[in-house]
Amino acid sequence: MRWYNARNAIIVDKERREMFTYTEEKKFTKEQVQQLFLSVNWISGNYPERLYKALMNSSTVLTVWDDQKLVGLTRVLDDTEMLAQIHYVLVDPAYQGMGIAGKMIEYIKEKYKDFMYIDGMPEDKENVPFYQKHGFSLMENGAAIQICNYENVH
C-alpha cells in the first residue's frame, strides 16, 4: 500500500472487507475526541476542552473514521524541518487488531520522510515492539522524561 501526503485517503482492507477513512482534516468534535480517549482510559479524555484545543493546534492530527464514528487518532508535533514527535496513537478497543494503528504510523512515516528524526513516545513499555515493527529503534542512551501536572489542572 502506498501512502501520499494527501489530505484524505480511503483504505479498503479486502481481506476483512472493512472500509475506513483516514484524514488530516480536523473536523472532529470535542465529544468525539473525548469518547475515543476515554475508550482507551486515557486521562486526557477527562479534559475535553483542553484536549480539543491541543489537537486543533497540533501540526498533524490523523483521524480514522468508520462512517461517522471516530475510531483512531494520531497526533504529531513538528518543527517544520528536522523533528516530528508522535504523541498519540490510539484506536478504539472495538477496532483494535485491525491494523489501523500500523496504517496510521506508516502514513506519518511517509509524510515526515524528509525530516531528520521521527520520534515515537509510547507511554507504555509494552507498546515498544509495535513501534519497532514499524522501523523505530530504542535510543541507546536516551529516555523519555516528563513532569505530570494533570492533578493540578482544573
Residue ranges of model-derived segments:
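Short amphipathic alpha-helix that is part of the acyltransferase structural core
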Residues: 9-46, 142, 154
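A conserved beta-turn-beta hairpin within the catalytic core of GNAT-like acetyltransferases
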Residues: 78-86, 96, 141
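Conserved beta-strand in the GNAT
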Residues: 63, 69-78, 85-90
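Conserved catalytic-core motifs of GNAT/GCN5-like acyltransferases
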Residues: 119-121, 132, 137-153
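Conserved acetyl-CoA-binding loop-helix of GNAT-fold acetyltransferases
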Residues: 91, 97-110
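Conserved GNAT acetyl-CoA-binding A-motif
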Residues: 110-123
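Active-site rim helix/loop that mediates acceptor-substrate recognition in acyltransferases
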Residues: 38-61
